[in-house]
């Protein structure tokens, strides 16, 4: 299922994504937990995904353990980041 939020996130250049709330799967609670883990921008979140070698499994695990993000939300975030980096041409 593709949501409007996902479509917007994927079609917007990363530099123009100004809030973590624009990332699919990120709501107010997840935003607070990411901020507590030192992630305050969408660019930092993509950077963390890149550090984890663009592995959705590793990203889900990191979100669950480092940020206490629920499994459903973690999967949505990881899949959106994978799709975003694919569109950016990152190998």
Question: Where are the regions that the model predicts?
Answer:
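C-terminal extensions
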Residues: 1-91
């Amino acid at each position: 299922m593709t949501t409007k939020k996902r479509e917007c996130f994927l079609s917007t250049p990363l530099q123009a994504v100004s809030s973590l709330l624009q990332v699919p799967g990120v709501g107010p609670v997840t935003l607070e937990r990411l901020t507590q883990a030192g992630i305050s921008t969408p660019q930092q979140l993509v950077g963390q995904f890149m550090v984890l070698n663009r592995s959705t499994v590793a990203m889900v695990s990191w979100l669950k353990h480092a940020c206490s993000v629920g499994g459903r939300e973690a999967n949505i975030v990881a899949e959106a980041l994978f799709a975003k980096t694919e569109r950016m041409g990152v190998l």
